[in-house]
Curated annotation (Swiss-Prot):
Disulphide bridges: C2-C16, C9-C19, C15-C24, C18-C35
Keyword Aminoacyl-tRNA synthetase included in the entry's annotation: no
Protein name, as recorded: Iota-conotoxin-like S11.2
One of the record's GO cellular component terms: extracellular region
Domain notes: The cysteine framework is XI (C-C-CC-CC-C-C).
Protein origin, superkingdom: Eukaryota
Positions of the propeptide segment: 43
Modified residues (D-methionine): M41
Tissue specificity of this protein: Expressed by the venom duct.
């Protein structure tokens, strides 16, 4: 889920987006939009 509200990433898209592997990134990630290979914002 998202870092602050702990809701599923798909619930609040402006918080974070989930990749198939389940990690999250800011929706403003310009390198891989909505994706991350690290634990950033994963909780």
């Amino acid at each position: 889920g998202c870092k602050k509200d702990r809701k599923p990433c798909s619930y609040q898209a402006d918080c974070c987006n989930c990749c198939p592997i389940g990690t999250c990134a800011p929706s403003t990630n310009w390198i891989l939009p909505g994706c991350s290979t690290g634990p950033f914002m994963a909780r």
